[in-house]
C-alpha cells in the first residue's frame, strides 16, 4: 500500500500568509507605469509559493520516495527514492537554531535528508522503524509547530493592519 505524506498545512499557510503580508501593498503603492507588472509578479510569486510547498513523500512496502514540485526541481531540488533494505542508519546533525536534521544513510554511503515538515510525521516515523528497525523515537519536526502558527498569526495581523491603513 502506498501512503502519501504532504507538506504540513501549517507550513504552507504560514509561507502564503507571510508572502501576502509582504506583497499585498506593492501593487497599490507602485507608480502607474508599474501597476500591471507588479500585479503580474504578485500572482506569479503566489503561484511559486503554492508550487514550492507541494513537495511530498510516498512510502510503500519496498521503498520511500521524495517527490519535488516542478518549481522545486527547476531550482535544483531532486526527487529521490531509497529502498528500505538499503538504509543502514540515520544520522543526526544539529542546526544553528538548536534542533536537529536527520539523514538517511544508505549502504552506498549516500545521504538523503529525512523530511521533517510533513503531515502525519509520527506515522511516518513509525513506518521508518517498522521497515528499517532503526530507532527514531526521539525525532521531531525541525521546528516546533507553534512557530508556524505564530508566523501565520503575525502575518494575518500585518494584512489586517495594511487593510485598515488602506481603507482609512
Residue ranges, per PLM feature:
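N-terminal membrane-targeting/pre-transmembrane regions
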Residues: 1-30, 109-110, 134-159
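Alpha-helical transmembrane segments
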Residues: 41-44, 110
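Juxtamembrane boundary at the C-terminal end of a transmembrane helix
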Residues: 158-168
Amino acid at each position: 500500500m502506498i501512503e502519501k505524506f504532504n507538506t504540513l498545512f501549517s507550513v504552507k499557510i504560514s509561507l502564503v500568509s507571510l508572502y501576502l503580508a509582504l506583497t499585498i501593498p506593492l501593487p497599490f503603492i507602485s507608480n502607474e507605469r508599474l501597476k500591471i507588472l507588479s500585479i503580474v509578479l504578485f500572482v506569479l510569486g503566489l503561484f511559486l509559493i503554492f508550487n514550492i510547498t507541494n513537495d511530498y513523500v510516498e512510502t510503500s512496502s519496498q521503498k520511500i520516495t521524495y517527490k519535488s514540485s516542478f518549481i522545486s526541481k527547476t531550482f535544483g531540488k531532486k526527487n529521490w527514492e531509497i529502498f528500505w533494505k538499503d538504509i543502514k542508519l540515520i544520522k543526526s546533525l544539529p542546526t544553528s537554531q538548536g534542533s536537529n536534521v536527520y539523514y538517511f544513510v544508505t549502504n552506498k554511503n549516500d545521504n538523503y535528508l529525512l523530511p521533517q515538515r510533513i503531515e502525519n510525521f509520527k506515522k511516518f516515523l513509525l513506518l521508518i522503524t517498522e521497515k528499517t528497525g532503526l530507532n527514531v523515537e526521539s525525532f521531531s519536526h525541525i521546528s516546533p509547530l507553534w512557530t508556524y502558527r505564530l508566523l501565520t498569526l503575525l502575518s494575518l495581523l500585518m494584512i489586517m493592519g495594511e487593510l485598515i491603513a488602506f481603507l482609512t
